[in-house]
Regions:
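Generic structural signal for hydrophobic core residues of well-folded globular domains
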Residues: 27, 44-49, 85, 89, ...
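Short, charged low-complexity linear motifs
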Residues: 23-30, 58, 116-119
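P-loop NTPase catalytic cores that bind/hydrolyze ATP
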Residues: 32-46, 83, 203, 207-210
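SAM-dependent methyltransferase catalytic region
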Residues: 59, 63, 67-240
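Non-catalytic nucleic-acid substrate-recognition regions in nucleic-acid-modifying enzymes
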Residues: 1-40, 48
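Short coil/turn segments at secondary-structure boundaries
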Residues: 32-40, 52-61, 93-96
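Extended, well-ordered alpha-helical segments in internal regulatory regions
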Residues: 48-52, 170
Length: 240
């Protein structure tokens, strides 16, 4: 939240505070470790308002638009789309022709492009008429820059950051490997140079910013909690 957010002015009665603390303490650790937990929580929080607007029969105005149009992407869909774009770029760079002609399984090819903290489990390989493996997703990367420092990724409806957090977690190890960067430096450069997002829901943008920050702070050997570069994500309002 912003430092001047009204949320910091809210004071709960002690009994309500204890109820809330008990609810939080009962949440499984896996929920806290998931980068998209806050986003899904916010979507469920908005579901009542969304249903009320949809059932009212009234015209949807700019104030109602964020709640009505909010629909976050399931993790496997995010992974599939990124694996067959960024993953295809990485596989095309890593896999020499001899591997594509000699490797006997799709799993073997995926293992050849894996790095610590990186895998592309949804990346698809297919076999051509000559029994050579090829990467169908290569068509998605035509025109991509050779250097990842020049790659600009934008999610124009980024919500709470599901896509940009996932691609952050895949770009960091790739840039570490290619550019021989430390984890801390790679995290900073991916935030500064690669990932961008726009969103009409101001609260979602705040959640997205926190999700990216949390991913960077939690990244192994990246310095933990620290000041990060400014994020290239913005609340675009409803003026367009």
């Amino acid at each position: 939240f912003r430092a001047d957010s009204p949320v910091f002015e809210v004071e709960l009665p002690p009994e309500k505070q204890r109820q809330l603390e008990n609810l939080v303490s009962d949440i499984e650790n896996e929920v806290f470790n998931a980068s998209d937990s806050l986003g899904w929580t916010y979507q469920y929080w908005q579901s009542k308002k969304k249903n009320e607007i949809n059932n009212s029969g009234n015209k949807v105005g700019d104030k109602e638009l964020p709640a009505v149009t909010q629909l976050f992407t399931e993790p496997y869909m995010v992974e599939y789309l990124i694996d067959n774009s960024l993953g295809a770029w990485w596989a095309n760079r890593c896999l020499k022709k001899k591997y594509l002609s000699s490797e006997i399984s799709e799993t073997g090819l995926q293992e050849r492009i894996s790095l610590p903290n990186l895998n592309f489990d949804y990346l698809k390989f297919e076999v051509d008429d000559n029994n050579y493996w090829f990467i169908p997703g290569v068509d998605n990367i035509l025109g991509w820059p050779e250097s990842l420092s020049e790659l600009k990724v934008i999610d124009p409806a980024c919500g709470s950051g599901h896509f940009i957090v996932t691609i952050f977690l895949k770009l960091v190890p790739i840039r570490m490997e290619i550019e021989k960067l430390s984890a801390e430096k790679a995290c900073d450069l991916v935030i500064r140079e690669n990932i961008h997002g726009l969103e009409i829901d101001q609260r979602c943008i705040e959640i997205a910013a926190f999700a990216i920050a949390l991913a960077a702070w939690k990244y192994p050997n990246a310095g933990g909690f620290r000041k990060l570069p400014d994020f290239n994500i913005a609340w675009c309002g409803q003026a367009i």
